[in-house]
Amino acid sequence: MSTSDDIHNTTATGKCPFHQGGHDQSAGGGTTTRDWWPNQLRVDLLNQHSNRSNPLGEDFDYRKEFSKLDYYGLKKDLKALLTESQPWWPADWGSYAGLFIRMAWHGAGTYRSIDGRGGAGRGQQRFAPLNSWPDNVSLDKARRLLWPIKQKYGQKISWADLFILAGNVALENSGFRTFGFGAGREDVWEPDLDVNWGDEKAWLTHRHPEALAKAPLGATEMGLIYVNPEGPDHSGEPLSAAAAIRATFGNMGMNDEETVALIAGGHTLGKTHGAGPTSNVGPDPEAAPIEEQGLGWASTYGSGVGADAITSGLEVVWTQTPTQWSNYFFENLFKYEWVQTRSPAGAIQFEAVDAPEIIPDPFDPSKKRKPTMLVTDLTLRFDPEFEKISRRFLNDPQAFNEAFARAWFKLTHRDMGPKSRYIGPEVPKEDLIWQDPLPQPIYNPTEQDIIDLKFAIADSGLSVSELVSVAWASASTFRGGDKRGGANGARLALMPQRDWDVNAAAVRALPVLEKIQKESGKASLADIIVLAGVVGVEKAASAAGLSIHVPFAPGRVDARQDQTDIEMFELLEPIADGFRNYRARLDVSTTESLLIDKAQQLTLTAPEMTALVGGMRVLGANFDGSKNGVFTDRVGVLSNDFFVNLLDMRYEWKATDESKELFEGRDRETGEVKYTASRADLVFGSNSVLRAVAEVYASSDAHEKFVKDFVAAWVKVMNLDRFDLL
């Protein structure tokens, strides 16, 4: 412990006592608030990817920059790069095709259809944790190989687009005809913090396939893209991997045929690397010393590169033409008998026991080896359903080529949203069901049409609560991760959304709005639903004494039922929507955490979320018409009463039961129950960050600001899927 003498002594020597010692004195060092309170609400997730982290500035327009790109010149440069072997990371057989295909695959393969997060859309492979995942060993080298090309073309091509395009060019240069390529992935400049990669604290912790159905996780082990190539938990049993493969690829939105095509296609080119024990491999990029300059996994085995490279620890080459597209994967799979063996690193794999040595060595032309396969490759032969598909592809290579081309396109574009977001000269013309296609607009309402429609809606007999609820139900399905959902298409009127419990009250307004649409003869139901919300908000603001114009951008269209994949749209059904005080399940997370999750999917900031919840409550927009959180005697009036009464110390809150999901607010003097609330309500008084925002809106001078902020956030949500307005 320091004494006054210690301080005097250091002062006498001219040294500041506070600059002594080994404590971390840097910004952000020391014990953090999350160390003290690990369950603290993650409001910070709503502040990701702001302009403060973007070196390009808020005026940068990627689509505009991309239009200046010499696209085919870029592809030519990528093609040349494939065979320009570098001594610091020599190319197998003189080609980086397999490496770039793996880079693209592993960038896109993190996508999870259950919550729309992950995927290649923002170039997240550059950042932790993905840049240092065990399954991404050596992909740091692939990205570094691409740097001269990225440097040459600058901001005309994003890293996110370049990763996927490099994979496409690698396939094409190997003799494969791809389905196409859509650009439009914009880079971000920091890791995504909202993606739940799992609770495990150790890499490669095994997960049971059944558990994947209960959580938004894509892989069966922490740190893998899909499954353990040695079988579940290193079982070495091909058949036991079938359930894990189905669960993982299913979470990416793939069926059995797409799964077989992707595994076989991805393993037609290139190899795995396991020249020696993985104990020779150094720390990953995030843990590597500063002089490594962002590279990781430096190996001390031999030269550490080329023939001595160690990546997964497996040493497998599937085909005899590993740099040229072929059907050899299936031919070898069924032609030979396979015996379990181990790689030089000790990993479980299989070798064709009755095959001649027909596989070329990647660095010594005088050497040959027998075909080898991963445990999970053999699953395609021994699982009955996978085997049927695999034999069909064996006997019909063109069917395999077509299936892989489409599955690869789906894999690499799954998180980009509708086709209208794609840019570039190689965008396929065909509409695909997983893109949630929409018909072309045939009519855009005039200003007079909009005025007439607003009058019709206002005179329809629908209340403010009903008008606001139906518009929110339509628009709030949007997911910022994969750009799915939203009001465009009016899929609220279609299956499955029309039957969701959360929409039970909201859809009661649909017959009235459908009648207005029919009488108008021109406007889309999608536009009318959003316009209903406009009318509701304007009426509520007027009732509060404010004349507010809610901006409305027409041009939405109505999807057909045959353009709507019911199974995939079921994934958009919320397990909770705190904006409507809805929660279907109590076995996942807390209500307030799920509110943050929903707000983050809607790309809302903390103030936007706060304004919307406060407004939705006083407008009576709870999914079931309950009074929870309706802290006002003027339902339907756009007031700041929610905040005023929430922060009023006259009321004391107590849980109604042990679940602590619902609460009663009693007058401290009389004991009378004045209000009821959910956790999604009380969090705005409990959480210190959200309370700070709520205090702004509860202030005596804040009513007009609150209304304006609510309207701005409301319009943002209504237009989240209007990519045509960008």
From Swiss-Prot:
Region (Disordered): 1-33
Binding site for heme b: H267
PTM comment: Formation of the three residue Trp-Tyr-Met cross-link is important for the catalase, but not the peroxidase activity of the enzyme.
Pfam family of the protein (one): peroxidase
Gene Ontology MF terms in the entry: catalase activity; heme binding; metal ion binding
Alphabetized PROSITE patterns for the sequence: PEROXIDASE_1, PEROXIDASE_2, PEROXIDASE_4
The protein's required cofactors: heme b
Note accompanying the cofactor annotation: Binds 1 heme b (iron(II)-protoporphyrin IX) group per dimer.
Catalysed conversion reaction: H2O2 + AH2 = A + 2 H2O; 2 H2O2 = O2 + 2 H2O
Cross-link Tryptophyl-tyrosyl-methioninium (Trp-Tyr) (with M-252): where in chain: W105-Y226
Protein name in the entry: Catalase-peroxidase
GO cellular component terms, semicolon-separated: cytosol
Tryptophyl-tyrosyl-methioninium (Tyr-Met) (with W-105) crosslink residues: Y226-M252
SUPFAM superfamilies named in the record: Heme-dependent peroxidases (SSF48113)
Enzyme Commission numbers on file: 1.11.1.21
Subunit structure: Homodimer or homotetramer.
Active site (catalytic residues): H106 (proton acceptor)
Keywords: Heme, Hydrogen peroxide, Iron, Metal-binding, Oxidoreductase, Peroxidase
Gene giving rise to this polypeptide: katG
Site residues, Transition state stabilizer: R102
Protein family: Belongs to the peroxidase family. Peroxidase/catalase subfamily.
Function: Bifunctional enzyme with both catalase and broad-spectrum peroxidase activity.
NCBIfam families given in the database record: cat_per_HPI, PRK15061.1
One biological process term in Gene Ontology: cellular response to hydrogen peroxide
